[in-house]
Amino acid sequence: MPSAFVMISCNFGSAKDVTSELHDIDGVEQVLIVSGIYDIIVRITVQNKDDLDRLLLRVRRMDEIQSTLTLIITQSQ
């Protein structure tokens, strides 16, 4: 099952609204508001690569999101 962290930069003042929307997406396990270059970190786990692609596309298309950086987890201990 593919898992990834997605770092998200969003429009100023929109982080809380974006997190609410992210929580409603199947496959989203955790949503964290952070400080720094990125505003939000999301942990996702899906059934297969196609589901991962669809979820990432859905996130990238959200109006308040400026950019994303995806880190696919290759090993977990």
Tell me the role of every PLM-derived stretch.
Residues M1-Q77:
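A compositional/biophysical signature of low hydrophobicity enriched in polar/charged and small residues
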